């Protein structure tokens, strides 16, 4: 099965173009103001114009007021919501949009129980645990992922072109999600890194 690829944290037209040209399946926009990758819904609406049909638009939120999420959903065609804070299932389900729930993996976290708390989530996005919110570019121990996880698995956390092939072969996620691993600086993407990452995923797919 083809591993889906999401490039997250885009802020510039040329970076959206590069991700689409490389073959990304989804483009993620960060609507979390403290993040250096933050874009306003109005700015994202401009960037979305460069995304062709059948490439998903993902909106990432962290403990946001519901009205803010609704405003973003009205401003641009978000296909999937992604929640990275302390949101519960009732919160995540209220927007009538498919959603991913992020889990920050650490020893002691029961991922099966966590996934069971979000039965209507389209998938569980697994990231490394860091203090505060947002990705830290760290890889977590993939052996902490249980084989009986009752959700589609999206793998994130410290992925790069160098390690994503191993990740795809070992974890077999339905999708991989990358931000800092394809950056020149925070919020600015490196187009050669994007192309190399996508190529590494496709090569791994061919070997499975």
Curated annotation (Swiss-Prot):
Enzyme class: isomerase
Listed EC numbers: 5.3.1.24
Signal peptide boundaries: none
Catalyzed reaction equations: N-(5-phospho-beta-D-ribosyl)anthranilate = 1-(2-carboxyphenylamino)-1-deoxy-D-ribulose 5-phosphate
Pfam families assigned: PRAI
InterPro entries, sorted: Aldolase_TIM (IPR013785), PRAI_dom (IPR001240), RibuloseP-bd_barrel (IPR011060), TrpF_fam (IPR044643)
Keywords, comma-separated and alphabetical: Amino-acid biosynthesis, Aromatic amino acid biosynthesis, Isomerase, Tryptophan biosynthesis
Entry keyword annotation includes Chloroplast: no
GO molecular function annotation: phosphoribosylanthranilate isomerase activity
Keyword Amino-acid biosynthesis: yes
Pathway: Amino-acid biosynthesis; L-tryptophan biosynthesis; L-tryptophan from chorismate: step 3/5
BP terms from Gene Ontology: L-tryptophan biosynthetic process
Family per record: Belongs to the TrpF family.
NCBIfam families per UniProt: PRK01222.1-4 (NF002298), PRK01222.1-6 (NF002299)
Cited HAMAP family: PRAI (MF_00135)
Name used for this protein in its record: N-(5'-phosphoribosyl)anthranilate isomerase
């Amino acid at each position: 099965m083809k591993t889906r690829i999401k490039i997250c944290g885009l802020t510039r037209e040329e970076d959206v173009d590069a991700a689409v040209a490389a073959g990304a399946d989804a483009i993620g926009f960060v609507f979390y103001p403290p993040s250096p990758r933050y874009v306003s819904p109005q700015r994202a609406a401009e960037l979305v114009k460069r995304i062709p049909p059948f490439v998903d638009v993902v909106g990432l939120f962290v403990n946001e007021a519901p009205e803010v999420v609704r405003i973003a959903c009205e401003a641009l065609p978000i296909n999937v919501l992604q929640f990275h804070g302390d949101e519960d299932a009732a919160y995540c389900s209220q927007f009538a949009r498919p959603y991913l729930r992020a889990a920050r993996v650490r020893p002691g976290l029961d991922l099966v129980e966590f996934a069971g708390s979000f039965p209507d989530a389209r998938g569980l996005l697994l990231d490394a645990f860091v203090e505060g919110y947002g990705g830290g570019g760290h890889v977590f121990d993939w052996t902490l992922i249980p084989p009986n996880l009752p959700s589609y698995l999206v793998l994130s956390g410290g992925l790069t072109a160098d390690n994503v092939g191993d990740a795809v072969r070992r974890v077999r996620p339905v999708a991989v999600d990358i931000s800092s691993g394809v950056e020149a600086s925070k919020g600015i993407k490196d187009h050669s890194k994007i192309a190399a990452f996508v190529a590494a995923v496709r090569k791994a797919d061919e070997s499975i």
